[in-house]
Design a protein with these regions (language model features):
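Auxiliary Fe-S-binding modules of radical SAM enzymes
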Residues: 1-78, 109-116, 143-154, 176, ...
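Local cysteine-cluster metal-coordination motifs and their immediate loop/turn environment
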Residues: 59-71, 82-97
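Short, surface-exposed acidic/glycine-rich loop or hinge patches that mediate macromolecular interfaces
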Residues: 84, 162-165, 230, 295
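Glycine/Thr-rich phosphate-binding loops of Rossmann-like dinucleotide-binding domains
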Residues: 89, 133, 192, 261, ...
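Core AdoMet radical
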Residues: 94-111, 117-169, 174-208, 222, ...
Length: 317
């Protein structure tokens, strides 16, 4: 069977996913490809100490990312700003839901210091949803971008931000700060969005991504979805087309992993072969960079993207 035929077969036969087996205590038994080694290196310890010293939050820790050990051993981390408590309670996310503390005015400078200490060429800045603030912390994100750019003028800055409840002026505040990559995740397919994402809508997320391209046509945009929540192949296909239709050049697809027993259970394990097939499909409909695999997360190996190539592509879209 040819590669393309094999991919089509996988996408049309979701029964080839693995059922989820559970232990007596209710915890899931993960397939072999999801078992992560815990590498330790001088860079891992350096990153750990630097994060503590600068009193920074990372999504690697707060969201219990399975790639933390690998990324920190490579000297990379995704910095989470605007606090460590989120105003939303999405059913896939391990970040604590609570009344957030006030923004810390010196946080942008601390993030910039982290970029300098780590010698980063690519930084990912993400945030908790701050629906308690009039601008959703958009101004704080913009100030962080500017602080990093001031000390690292050649760094690639990627932001992974909320939908700001659909307030396009706040989206424009981020755009005006000129990040290189504007990332906002769709997270899941349309049908599952009300269950998976608290106070978010499928169409609002697409509107945000479309607006970025409207006001900044050359800005690279990115989105991603999780698999294994009960979605169908047709729903994944539609979601990919929807993301591409609003101009996104980059898309990520990864396996949903249940962070705790209080969050949504995994419905199925998606095989590496199916992820490869989705990568081929996404590339076939025009995405310029696709990261698709069981352990892929939105910022996993974000620095592997060739920004110069994507900028040329953006000029043509």
């Amino acid at each position: 069977m040819s590669c393309s035929l094999h991919s089509a077969y996988l996408l049309q036969n979701p029964q080839y996913r693995l059922d989820v087996e559970r232990r007596k205590d209710g915890s899931t038994i993960k397939p072999s490809w999801l078992k992560v080694k815990f590498p330790s290196s001088p860079l891992f310890h350096f990153t750990t100490e630097m994060v503590r010293d600068l009193q920074l939050n990372t999504v690697c820790e707060e969201a219990r990312c399975p790639n933390r050990w690998e990324c920190w051993s490579r000297g990379t981390a995704t910095i989470m700003i605007a606090g460590k408590q989120c105003t939303r309670a999405c059913k896939f996310c391990a970040v604590t839901t609570a009344r957030p503390e006030p923004l810390k005015a010196d946080e942008p400078q601390r993030v910039a210091e982290a970029a300098v200490r780590m010698g980063l060429r690519h930084i990912v800045i993400t945030m908790v949803a701050r629906d308690d603030l009039p601008d959703g912390a958009a101004g704080h994100v913009a100030r962080t971008i500017q602080a990093v750019r001031q000390v690292c003028p050649d760094i690639v800055i990627e932001v992974l931000v909320s939908d700001f409840q659909g307030r396009l002026r706040d989206v424009e505040t981020i755009v005006d700060a000129k990040p290189d990559i504007y990332n906002h995740n769709l997270e899941t397919v349309r049908r599952l969005t009300p269950v998976v994402r608290h106070r978010a809508t499928y169409d609002r997320s697409l509107m945000v991504l479309a607006h970025v391209k409207t006001v900044a046509p050359k800005m690279i945009t990115k989105s991603g979805i999780m698999l294994g929540l009960g979605e169908t192949g047709d729903e994944i296909r539609i979601a990919l087309h929807d993301i591409r239709s609003v101009g996104c050049e980059i898309v990520t697809l990864g396996q949903y992993l249940q962070p705790s027993s209080q969050l949504l259970p995994v419905k199925s394990w998606v095989t590496p072969e199916e992820f490869d097939a989705w990568k081929q499909y996404a590339e076939s409909i025009g995405f310029r960079y696709v990261a698709s695999g069981p352990l892929v997360r939105s910022s996993y190996y974000a620095d592997a993207v060739s920004i110069s190539d994507l900028r040329v592509t953006s000029d043509l879209t």
